[in-house]
């Protein structure tokens, strides 16, 4: 298997299981990274330490290793006074990982969330998120990474912005991996199957879950994703962390962790490794148990409409609430109408836009909290306004026309 071949990676995940690497942050701290410092700073200041970490995973048998760039977006780096070094540190991270991988492994750029909330709860906008991730993906692509891996995201809208930034500015395969809570939803309330459907509809090559406690908690999440029929990526933690003698340890040893991952192989998982608390020893044990099993569970291939917190098969939509918006519509009145329907008994909400402003429809949808409660059908004779709204909608919307789009919208 040769690194630097995106076609090879996409072919491989269709035919076999690839082994991912494990945690890097914890191992960097053991190697001298001061607590609270930016891990990405080591890409430039201590590249040999980062190289040795990557090489340990390659030597353990990993097919795919990840760059040391998880908190490498500009927002996160600014917390360490390193915002102006965003491009430098990400490019350096890709270069050192490629050097360690050689011809023996693919290199995936690890990219995590900004830690910010979207409007109206925070200050992040879709366009700003897009620009932040565009900067990072271009830097790691310039450094030679083979794959883009967005991981540990909790907001479907943020990872959608990241995904589009990667797809529209590089030709690299993209993995999208979400983190889930104990209730088996993301922090923002999205179900596993909805995550898979939304992200695949926007062009993700592989979807999945990572972090999120340990293997025994994540199995139900992956089982729900498997029902969509998509190939999956999974990277659980080594159980739960605890502090012993002032040090963080995890409650699963390498053998137990690998044993618990055996049941994942028949759930369409094609990329599997570890997250927090795992080391090359965990990967060695996992490699001993690797197998390729055909998924034999039920597959729900029906087209779905998905909001941030609910989904419904198109065939099951019976009642639709309608809100008409024009350029003169008061935004607060529209919000009140949508909020009322969102908490009512309607299956979906149709927003009909009649106007010339290309951005108004998308702006209104982005700023209404209740918009995530019920799936949307978005209608407009203004194609540009409709496209802009679909682009920033955190789900799979319904549309009334055969308008070509790359945002997964379903004709209803």
Each language-model region and where it sits:
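Domain-level signal for soluble alpha/beta catalytic cores
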Residues: 1-412
């Amino acid at each position: 298997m040769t690194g630097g071949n995106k076609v090879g990676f996409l072919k491989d995940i269709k035919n076999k299981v690839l082994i991912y690497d494990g945690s890097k942050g914890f191992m960097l701290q053991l190697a001298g990274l001061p607590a609270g410092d930016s891990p990405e700073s080591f890409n430039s200041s201590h590249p040999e330490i980062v190289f040795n970490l990557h090489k340990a995973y390659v030597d353990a048998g990993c097919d795919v290793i990840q760059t040391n760039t998880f908190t490498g977006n500009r927002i996160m780096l600014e917390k360490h006074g390193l915002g102006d070094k965003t491009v430098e540190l990400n490019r350096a991270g890709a270069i050192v990982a490629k050097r360690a991988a050689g011809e023996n492994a693919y290199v995936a750029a690890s990219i995590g969330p900004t830690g910010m909330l979207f409007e109206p709860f925070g200050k992040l906008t879709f366009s700003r998120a897009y620009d932040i991730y565009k900067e990072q993906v271009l830097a790691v692509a310039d450094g030679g990474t083979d794959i883009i891996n967005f991981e540990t995201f909790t907001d479907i809208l943020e990872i959608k912005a990241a995904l589009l930034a990667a797809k529209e500015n590089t030709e690299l395969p993209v993995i999208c991996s979400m983190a889930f809570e104990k209730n088996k939803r993301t922090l923002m309330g999205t179900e596993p199957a909805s995550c898979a459907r939304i992200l695949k509809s926007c062009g993700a090559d592989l979807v999945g879950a990572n972090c999120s406690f340990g293997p025994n908690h994540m199995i139900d999440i992956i089982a729900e994703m498997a029902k969509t029929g998509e190939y999956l990526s999974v990277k659980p933690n080594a159980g739960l962390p605890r502090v012993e003698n002032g040090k963080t340890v995890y409650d699963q040893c390498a053998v137990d962790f690998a044993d618990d991952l055996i049941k994942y192989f028949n759930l369409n998982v094609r990329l599997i490794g570890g997250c927090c608390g795992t080391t090359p020893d965990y990967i060695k044990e996992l490699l001993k148990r690797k197998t390729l099993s055909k998924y034999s569970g039920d597959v729900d291939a029906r087209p779905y409409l998905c909001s941030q917190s609910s989904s419904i098969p198109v065939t099951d939509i019976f009642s639709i609430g309608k809100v008409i918006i024009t350029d003169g519509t008061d935004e607060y009145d529209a919000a009140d109408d949508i909020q009322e329907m969102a908490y009512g008994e309607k299956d979906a909400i149709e927003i009909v836009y009649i106007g010339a402003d290309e951005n108004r429809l998308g702006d209104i949808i982005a700023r209404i909290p209740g918009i995530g409660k019920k799936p949307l059908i978005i209608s407009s004779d203004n194609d540009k306004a409709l496209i802009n709204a679909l682009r920033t909608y955190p789900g799979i919307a319904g549309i009334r026309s055969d308008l070509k789009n790359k945002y997964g919208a379903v004709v209803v």
